Amino acid sequence: MLTFCQYAVACCGREEREKLMRYAIIAGNRHAPLLYALTYPERFDKARPLRLFEFRGIRCVFAGYYFPQRYENWLCDDQSEFVRKVYDFKEGKDPCRNCFSQAFRVLSVTGDVTAVFMPCSTSRRYHRRFSGIAAFLESGGYARSGLDLICITEDRESKHTSGRRSGVDTANYMMARGLRGKRVVIVDDLLTSGDSLLEYAHNLERVGAIVTGAVFLARTFRMPPPATVRRVVWKHHLSALLTGK
């Protein structure tokens, strides 16, 4: 029963994995639903990469899926490569120009717009992470840079390392008066719960900015229940039997 799943993990591409995973799930392998969902995340998420969707009234676009580190040994090669890009972006090693340019084109905001960037835990981290993409967006005509319209006033614990995300003090930044009346697009590396997005958008609107959308490098994939995966797999399995695949 374990053999199908073991072979599927060894396969790097989705096509090679698909049939093996279907048989493993049908045979009752308890690991197979996890592997199937990771391989086909778009089948279990209402939002899709590089497609416009709305989150609590905010038009959003993300370039790809981010998977937590605990799943790293289960990912396809292209997924692992994208996750590495997310880490490199966070560290300021890769501005991910292609990902953000595609996302901005999908968002399709017309007229004068300013990119504002999600405040980080320190000023150093904020500028290291966003200065490269801010310069690219402005030079490429996608959006004016609003990097200097946000000032990090004090260090705080990173939300990604805090045990309680809601317990992290986020009031560690100031917004310039120049934001008043500006149409802005929020730019960040990762969309997970969306709490930070909503709070930041609210604060921007309080100072008079007009939030026209948000662009993310990645969205954290949320694992569906195994029963949901099995229903989807049976649907595709029956379809494959009918088409002879």
What is each model feature region?
Residues 123-127, 193-194:
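Loop/helix-junction capping segments adjacent to catalytic residues or to phosphate/diphosphate-binding pockets
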Residues 16-24:
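Alpha-helical repeat scaffolds
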Residues 147-244:
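PRPP/pyrophosphate-binding module of the type I phosphoribosyltransferase fold
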Residues 2-3, 130, 238-242:
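The feature marks helicase ATPase cores and/or their adjacent C-terminal helical subdomains
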Residues 30-113, 151-180, 220-222:
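Active-site-facing substrate-recognition patch
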Residues 125-144:
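Substrate-recognition/cap helix-loop segment adjacent to the acidic, metal-dependent catalytic center
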Residues 1-4, 9-12, 27-30:
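Short helix-capping/linker turns of helical repeat alpha-solenoids
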Residues 112-121:
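Short glycine-rich phosphate-binding loop at a beta-alpha junction
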